[in-house]
UniProtKB/Swiss-Prot annotation:
InterPro entries: Restrct_endonuc-II-like, tRNA_endonuc-like_dom_sf, UPF0102_YraN-like. It comes from the Bacteria. This is UPF0102 protein NMB2089. One of its GO terms (molecular function) is nucleic acid binding. HAMAP family: UPF0102. The lineage of its organism: Bacteria, Pseudomonadati, Pseudomonadota, Betaproteobacteria, Neisseriales. Belongs to the UPF0102 family.
Amino acid sequence: MRLNHKQGEAGEDAALAFLQSQGCTLLARNWHCAYGEIDLIVKNGGMILFVEVKYRKNRQFGGVAYSISPSKLLKLQRSVEYYLQQNRLTNVPCRLDAVLIEGSRPPEWIQNITG
């Protein structure tokens, strides 16, 4: 397994543990479709959260917040729409969030990354 993949998994593990500590329940992890991948799908109360996890060792290259490009955001939105269609989830409150992890700092939960 490549180092970046291992670090990515460790970042997802940390993000999941953080979200669970905030009361979230895991529905799916690394969910794939033709449009892309959703790192974590969790339920928080009555809301489904689609979570992009970003991990960086340090602030080099602008930090983790700069790693979610407009094209990545579009892929995520399309993946969310597809997930909702495939699971026949209509009129279910949902949101696209991000958990950013930078080095040894605590995770940062960005809610509603689509604005």
